[in-house]
Amino acid sequence: LKYLRNMIKISIIGGGGNVGYHLTAILLNAENIELIEVYNRTLDKIQYLKNDTSITTNLNQLKEADIYIICVADDAIVEVSKKLNFNNKLVVHTSGSVAMEELKCKANKGVFYLLQSFSKDKKIDFSNIPICIEATSKTDLELLKVLAKTISKNCYHINSEQRRNLHVSAVFVNNFVNHLYFIGNQICEDNNVPFEILHPIIKETASKIETLSPFDAQ
């Protein structure tokens, strides 16, 4: 692959969201990666990048890149992808629940799904994030693998159906569990007990899953 010898040029579409924010941060400092441009509907959320890379609000005049990474909300992926008129370029989205075929552009298609919960105010260690990739061609899949392994040790080839079900599993172990924390916190507040008293048992329960099956840890 020529990308093993040359810089991979990346354009991020939707740099103002949580995923786009963190992906921009890691790619700006990644080896053999050139983040040539970040797009967002409004400049205010990406203005801070003006000294590091090109920023734009115009989808019709994006710079030429090897990979265009769409980091917008799931329900905006179709509309955004329709506006990308590229040939022989790779366009990928980062959604866990949207099929690769939902990319409605002429370009080559793929998925670059980061299986992690992102918040702008919490720094993320990318080295252990599972990155699930999919592409319409072996060449593009190899390119995504090179990109993934540049920022993480964990790269998986996962198809759209597997990814959709994986996303459901992630909702159970992340969003549902976090809601249980919320309920626990409410009970503590109602009884004037500090929620911090539960931190050790929460951490112990979470750490068990690395050495025990969920059934055995129950």
State the predicted function of each range.
Residues 5-57:
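NAD(P)+-binding Rossmann beta1-loop-alpha1 motif at the extreme N-terminus of oxidoreductases
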Residues 8, 89, 129:
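Nucleotide donor/acceptor-binding cores
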Residues 12-14, 70, 133:
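Hydrophobic Val/Ile/Leu positions in short beta-strands of Rossmann-like dinucleotide-binding domains
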Residues 23, 80, 143-144:
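Hydrophobic side chains in well-ordered alpha-helices
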Residues 31-33, 63, 126:
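Structured loop/turn residues at beta-strand edges in well-structured enzyme cores
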Residues 39, 43-124:
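Rossmann-like NAD(P)(H) cofactor-binding subdomain of soluble oxidoreductases
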Residues 52, 108, 123-167, 171-210:
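Internal alpha-helical scaffold of NAD(P)-dependent oxidoreductase catalytic cores
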Residues 213-218:
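C-terminal active-site/capping subdomain that shapes the small-molecule cofactor and substrate pocket
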